[in-house]
Amino acid sequence: MNGLGGLNKSEHGVGIGLVQLQLPVTVTPQDLARQTQVIVDLVAKARRNQPGMDLVVFPEYALHGLSMDINPDIMCRMDGPEVAAFKAACKQNRIWGCFSIMEYNPGGMPYNSGIIIDDTGALKLYYRKMHPWVPVEPWEPGDLGIPVIDGPKGAKLALIICHDGMFPEMARECAYKGAEIMIRTAGYTAPIRESWRFTNQSNAFCNLMVTANVCMCGSDGTFDSMGEGMICNFDGSIIAHGTSGRVNEIITAEVRPDLVREARLGWGVENNIYQLGHRGYVAVAGGAQDAPYTYMHDLAAGRYRLPWEVEVKITDGTACGFEKPTRLYGKPAKSAAE
């Protein structure tokens, strides 16, 4: 059930709109300013489209396109004009918004960041992509963790970006911290279509969590993005799915975070987010509450290493034209983003 794309709002429903934004080409500060206005105008379109919409979501790369340009002249800052324009648009249209920026980083490569702004224009969530799509993307690994916030109607929201969603641990972290709706923004192109679809569904089902997911759309003359706005219910079923590939179409649905809460408390079979920490609770009181997974221990101890580690062929970005890095994670480099 999606309330006819959110046209029929229930008492506890949250209306979500996913903008399958036309893929832009952004080279200059003037291009950046024009694309900012495009997004601002689409916030207003979303409000006109559905007066009951609570949250409008724009894809990753909505401002900058897919060029991977790290020119500091077109990088954004949290106190810059682009974020200010998004805040004003949300306040003026009385709607929550999720936006993508490539963020200037004086100590390294730019961050691929996402923000959520409420309907008063206040910044509520600030996230930096944790898993850049290597070896293609040059972005600095995110360092803010995964925040979870109180969103529209009190729904618990989390945001991850594109390739993040290919790691089951990311969706699990969102749910473990309480997220009832996980937003996933992306710039993926057509070769990733099937992987995109089944991970959106599995991220929902494995965590009893709604997922709201959207890519860029259309062509920039080089790349072809796919749109594929997709909202999945907490049981993994698809509530809404944009399959037309039509640019700037807004895929809409109502979701029910109250039913997510009910399922997490009331489900027995396939309550996987609970059962992970309570293995075999029929046999032993409270279930086994150990951590039997080797990779978890190794990752936490800084010794994550695959049996075939030394044979992995692609371990930096040189194949995609980037210089081999010498700086370690967490160490600043004055000129890395210049």
UniProtKB/Swiss-Prot annotation:
<protein>
    <recommendedName>
        <fullName>Formamidase</fullName>
        <ecNumber>3.5.1.49</ecNumber>
    </recommendedName>
</protein>
<dbReference type="InterPro" id="IPR003010">
    <property type="entry name" value="C-N_Hydrolase"/>
</dbReference>
<keyword id="KW-0378">Hydrolase</keyword>
<dbReference type="GO" id="GO:0033388">
    <property type="term" value="P:putrescine biosynthetic process from arginine"/>
</dbReference>
<dbReference type="InterPro" id="IPR036526">
    <property type="entry name" value="C-N_Hydrolase_sf"/>
</dbReference>
<dbReference type="GO" id="GO:0050126">
    <property type="term" value="F:N-carbamoylputrescine amidase activity"/>
</dbReference>
<comment type="similarity">
    <text>Belongs to the carbon-nitrogen hydrolase superfamily. Aliphatic amidase family.</text>
</comment>
<comment type="function">
    <text>Is an aliphatic amidase with a restricted substrate specificity, as it only hydrolyzes formamide.</text>
</comment>
<feature type="active site" description="Proton donor">
    <location>
        <position position="129"/>
    </location>
</feature>
<feature type="domain" description="CN hydrolase">
    <location>
        <begin position="14"/>
        <end position="257"/>
    </location>
</feature>
<dbReference type="InterPro" id="IPR022843">
    <property type="entry name" value="Formamidase"/>
</dbReference>
<feature type="active site" description="Proton acceptor">
    <location>
        <position position="60"/>
    </location>
</feature>
<dbReference type="Pfam" id="PF00795">
    <property type="entry name" value="CN_hydrolase"/>
</dbReference>
<dbReference type="InterPro" id="IPR050345">
    <property type="entry name" value="Aliph_Amidase/BUP"/>
</dbReference>
<dbReference type="GO" id="GO:0004328">
    <property type="term" value="F:formamidase activity"/>
</dbReference>
<feature type="active site" description="Nucleophile">
    <location>
        <position position="162"/>
    </location>
</feature>
